[in-house]
Amino acid sequence: MIQPQTLLNVADNSGARKLMCIRVIGAAGNQRYARIGDVIIAVIKDAVPQMPLERSEVIRAVIVRTRKEFKGDDGIIIRYDDNAAVIIDQKGNPKGTRVFGAVAEELRELNLTKIVSLAPEVL
């Protein structure tokens, strides 16, 4: 579960390395926590030099992995090793051209198929 002030890894090659969540906007209803597939507003805390994204820039991101376990529709419980997000633009397209690490199958059901197609493994 991701809430404001949570630090996340960036799972794409957009140039950012670490994000800090500042607002949960894509959760169902008026929830305080973001889960896999939810959209957040975050600030970049660490970035690669000479890349388009810079430190302290405010961006949108979608959660692709969380340490908090979740139960899939088929009853399987999945927990990842880190909290990770993929940076997206206003239309929901990923800014990077690659996604690192596994992503959840539930992203496909949430119409985030571009992120799923870039991922090397879908669980």
Swiss-Prot record:
Pfam families: Ribosomal_L14. GO terms for cellular component: chloroplast ribosome; cytosolic large ribosomal subunit. One of its GO terms (biological process) is translation. GO terms for molecular function: large ribosomal subunit rRNA binding; structural constituent of ribosome. SMART domains: Ribosomal_L14. Transmembrane segments: none annotated. Keywords: Chloroplast, Plastid, Ribonucleoprotein, Ribosomal protein, RNA-binding, rRNA-binding. Belongs to the universal ribosomal protein uL14 family. Part of the 50S ribosomal subunit. Interacts with IOJAP. This is Large ribosomal subunit protein uL14c. It comes from Zea mays (Maize).
